[in-house]
């Protein structure tokens, strides 16, 4: 045909059999990619430390989605939660990956079958024998089936009636596990961080889909509405489908970037707003103060803090710190976290306890300033030594650690104090192994950041695609000089060659 690359879909325009075939092939490619990508991630994933080296710093993209739906065990005898087990069963990580690859092969065969046997009686009007698809009814069938799937997921899988449940955790991402969920039908069901809303919303949306699908199957649109919305044109279907896809992409970009019950921090990493608000810092401080109120020492209070919680309170795990052109997982930047050194407390020669002001998200460099409990600057690392008044040496600052591997250790050497002051600017202090992955020390983004960027980009492209195809559909007659009042339907809808006076016409 000599078609340009952006017109190649023209070959399936009047061919519903091969139209189905290319969609089957596309689904086969998606399913095959998912299974293959899962196997690749499993080959490089290190499950040895679920606290300091979980899946998100390792750049896992497919595994978190499998995990949140109930897959936690591997045929390699490890579990993402660290629990022990004897038999992972069929639906392990590898089992799900292989199932997707098998499904891909079956879809590939189905695509070939529909490409060969393209001219089915199903696509022809029994009365006239002409090619005809009832697109409003096809829409109803698709809506009904998707509603049934959505309802079944909410009723059976999420609630644990016939399925494992979904990933449930506490607000600070410490106790995550798979468990059944009870639907939330009250006002709390609109809380984006309430897992019960996932069950109730899938049930409600599924029921709505069943009702709407049944309506579109049984009720016929008026002729005026049919013509007005171009319901007989396959490009209307394309435009509407793109609208559904780009809207979904915008929604999931929001739930991923801002955080929600469906994007747990244990699987996708923390959000940037948790760093901006000092979310984990406040919780750690609250726990320490509670321990001190119970009579514990500073060492005991900080020693009770989980390294997993402390690891969230580190700026390198902020997805907004990684640039879009810094490829690779977070571990390629910082390295692999091996230990929490402990909480650093700085003390000047007057006995004031000082803390380092933390770096905001969108700064690459930031002055190292040490403040007392009243927010008064007591020490800093000056840019110009000649003009310094609050340097570490002048103020006589020492550092002492509580909790972690440096518990009760103290340092008074100015160079060492400066080193840990710079580290404290980035949150809790950790020891990283950079040699294993030859990490370069430059921050990377987490899968949360990449998912958001990718889906926002495609949503924007698909938005313009929706406008383009919608405009082509609505204004086709105006642009092509085609009479909109036609009785015969060709090309799934209305089509007439310019100057054709043989097609029957009827005024609406």
Curated annotation (Swiss-Prot):
Role this protein plays: One of the components of the core complex of photosystem II (PSII). It binds chlorophyll and helps catalyze the primary light-induced photochemical processes of PSII. PSII is a light-driven water:plastoquinone oxidoreductase, using light energy to abstract electrons from H(2)O, generating O(2) and a proton gradient subsequently used for ATP formation.
Cellular component aspect of the GO annotation: chloroplast thylakoid membrane; photosystem II
GO MF, one example: chlorophyll binding
Matches recorded under HAMAP family: PSII_PsbB_CP47
InterPro entries attached to this UniProt entry: PS_antenna-like (IPR000932), PS_II_antenna-like_sf (IPR036001), PSII_PsbB (IPR017486)
Entry membrane topology: Multi-pass membrane protein
Recorded name of the encoding gene: psbB
Cofactor binding description: Binds multiple chlorophylls. PSII binds additional chlorophylls, carotenoids and specific lipids.
Subunit structure: PSII is composed of 1 copy each of membrane proteins PsbA, PsbB, PsbC, PsbD, PsbE, PsbF, PsbH, PsbI, PsbJ, PsbK, PsbL, PsbM, PsbT, PsbY, PsbZ, Psb30/Ycf12, at least 3 peripheral proteins of the oxygen-evolving complex and a large number of cofactors. It forms dimeric complexes.
Organism superkingdom: Eukaryota
Compartment(s): Plastid, Chloroplast thylakoid membrane
NCBIfam families from the UniProt entry: PS_II_CP47 (TIGR03039)
One Pfam match: PSII
Biological process according to GO: photosynthetic electron transport in photosystem II
Family to which the UniProt record says this protein belongs: Belongs to the PsbB/PsbC family. PsbB subfamily.
Chain segments annotated as transmembrane: 21-36, 101-115, 140-156, 203-218, 237-252, 457-472
The protein, known as: Photosystem II CP47 reaction center protein
Alphabetical keyword list: Chlorophyll, Chloroplast, Chromophore, Membrane, Photosynthesis, Photosystem II, Plastid, Thylakoid, Transmembrane, Transmembrane helix
């Amino acid at each position: 045909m000599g078609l340009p690359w952006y017109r190649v879909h023209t070959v399936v325009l009047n061919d519903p059999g091969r139209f189905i075939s290319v969609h089957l092939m596309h689904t086969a490619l998606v399913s095959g990619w998912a299974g293959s990508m899962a196997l690749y991630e499993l080959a490089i994933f290190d499950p040895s430390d679920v606290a300091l080296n979980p899946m998100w710093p390792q750049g896992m993209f497919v595994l978190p989605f499998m995990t949140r739906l109930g897959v936690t065990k591997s045929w390699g005898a490890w579990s993402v939660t660290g629990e022990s087990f004897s038999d992972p069963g069929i639906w392990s990580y590898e089992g799900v990956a292989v199932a997707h690859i098998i499904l891909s092969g079956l879809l590939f065969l189905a695509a070939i079958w529909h490409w060969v046997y393209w001219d089915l009686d199903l696509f022809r009007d029994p009365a006239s024998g002409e090619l005809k698809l009832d697109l409003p009814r096809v829409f109803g069938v698709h809506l009904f089936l998707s509603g049934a799937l959505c309802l079944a997921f909410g009723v059976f899988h999420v609630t644990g009636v016939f399925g494992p449940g979904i990933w449930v955790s506490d607000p600070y991402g410490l106790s995550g596990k798979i468990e059944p969920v009870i639907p939330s039908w009250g006002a709390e069901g609109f809380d984006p961080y309430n897992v019960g809303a996932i069950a109730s919303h899938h049930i409600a949306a599924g029921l709505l889909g069943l009702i709407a699908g049944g309506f579109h199957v049984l009720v016929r649109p008026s002729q005026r509405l049919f013509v007005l919305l171009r319901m007989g044109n396959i490009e209307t279907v394309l435009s509407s489908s793109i609208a559904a896809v780009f809207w979904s992409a915008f929604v999931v970009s929001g739930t991923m970037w801002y955080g929600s019950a469906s994007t747990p921090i244990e699987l996708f990493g923390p959000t940037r707003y948790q760093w901006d608000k000092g979310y984990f810092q406040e919780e750690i401080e609250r726990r320490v103060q509670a321990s001190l109120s119970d009579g514990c020492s500073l060492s005991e209070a900080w020693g009770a803090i989980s390294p997993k919680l402390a690891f969230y309170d580190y700026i390198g795990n902020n997805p907004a710190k990684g640039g879009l052109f810094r490829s690779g997982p977070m571990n390629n930047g910082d390295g692999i976290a091996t230990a929490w050194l402990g909480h650093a407390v700085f003390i000047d020669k007057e006995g004031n306890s000082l803390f380092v002001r933390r770096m905001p998200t969108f700064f690459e460099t930031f002055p190292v300033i040490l403040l007392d409990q009243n927010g008064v600057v007591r020490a800093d690392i000056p840019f110009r030594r000649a003009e310094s008044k609050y340097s570490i040496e002048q103020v006589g600052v020492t550092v002492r650690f509580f909790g972690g591997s440096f518990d009760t250790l103290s340092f008074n050497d100015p160079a060492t104090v400066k080193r840990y002051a710079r580290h404290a600017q980035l949150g809790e202090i950790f020891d990283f192994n950079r040699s294993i992955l030859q990490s370069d020390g430059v921050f990377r983004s987490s899968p949360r950041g990449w998912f958001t960027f990718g889906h926002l980009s495609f949503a924007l492209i698909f938005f313009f695609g929706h406008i383009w195809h919608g405009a082509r559909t609505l204004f086709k007659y105006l642009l092509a000089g085609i009479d909109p009042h036609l009785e015969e339907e060709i090309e799934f809808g209305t089509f007439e060659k310019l100057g054709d006076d043989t097609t029957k016409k009827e005024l609406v």
